[in-house]
């Protein structure tokens, strides 16, 4: 299994809905949980909501017929600063401004365990962000997420921390930003 065995494909929201079961299975495998466990059920709910958001895009990675990883996200709507709500340290008003074409949220990037550390995540990341027309991308991680150094090595910079909502996995999240277009 090498990155050379993987093919990447771009999909919109309708196609993502058709692929939902496969996405849930890959998500569960990435985290080493059963598909019916709460973590996967919560992922399903989040994903279904995002499929219809403006600017939604999904990139899948397959080895033959097997979905080995995926990433997806959506564009923040104009005038909506909810994503940045409560971020500390507080950024400038200009930083918070959303136009509907400024910021793309990298919501999920998941790779099956057998395919981790083989370049699939980076390939998905670059394919998704390389196709974007926004000025920047953003993502949120748990404060102690093992992925943080990986994101930083890919050019992301931490801009602050936001409080989590009731029922979230974490009580707080670190927000990262990456200027687009991505260059390697």
Regions found by a protein language model. Name each.
Residues 72-108, 166-170:
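Conserved acyl-donor/pantetheine-binding loop and adjacent beta-alpha core of acyl/acetyltransferases
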Residues 106, 111-113, 117-130, 152-153:
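Conserved acetyl-CoA-binding loop-helix of GNAT-fold acetyltransferases
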Residues 1-21:
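Conserved N-terminal entry element of GNAT/NAT acetyltransferase domains
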Residues 152-161:
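Conserved acetyl-CoA-binding loop of GNAT-fold acetyltransferases
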Residues 23-38:
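Helix-loop element at the rim of GNAT/NAT acetyltransferase active sites that forms part
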Residues 104, 130-143:
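Conserved GNAT acetyl-CoA-binding A-motif
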Residues 36-58, 62-64, 68, 72-75, ...:
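Active-site rim helix/loop that mediates acceptor-substrate recognition in acyltransferases
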Residues 141-145, 164-184:
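C-terminal "cap" of GNAT-fold acetyltransferases
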């Amino acid at each position: 299994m090498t990155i050379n065995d993987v093919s990447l494909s771009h999909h919109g929201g309708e196609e993502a809905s058709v692929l939902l079961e496969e996405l849930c299975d890959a998500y569960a495998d990435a985290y080493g949980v059963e598909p019916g466990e709460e973590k996967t059920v919560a992922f399903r709910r989040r994903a279904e909501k995002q499929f219809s958001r403006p600017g939604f895009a999904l990139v899948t990675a397959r080895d033959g017929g097997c979905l080995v990883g995926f990433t997806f996200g959506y564009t923040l709507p104009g005038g909506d600063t909810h994503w940045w709500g409560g971020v500390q340290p507080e950024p400038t008003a200009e930083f918070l401004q959303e136009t509907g074409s400024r910021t793309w949220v990298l919501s999920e990037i998941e790779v099956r365990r057998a395919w981790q550390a083989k370049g699939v995540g980076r390939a998905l990341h670059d394919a998704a962000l390389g196709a974007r027309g926004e000025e920047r991308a953003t993502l949120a991680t748990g404060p102690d997420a093992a992925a943080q150094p990986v994101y930083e090595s890919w050019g992301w910079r931490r801009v602050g921390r936001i409080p989590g909502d009731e029922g979230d996995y974490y009580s707080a999240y670190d927000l990262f930003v990456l200027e687009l277009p991505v260059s390697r």
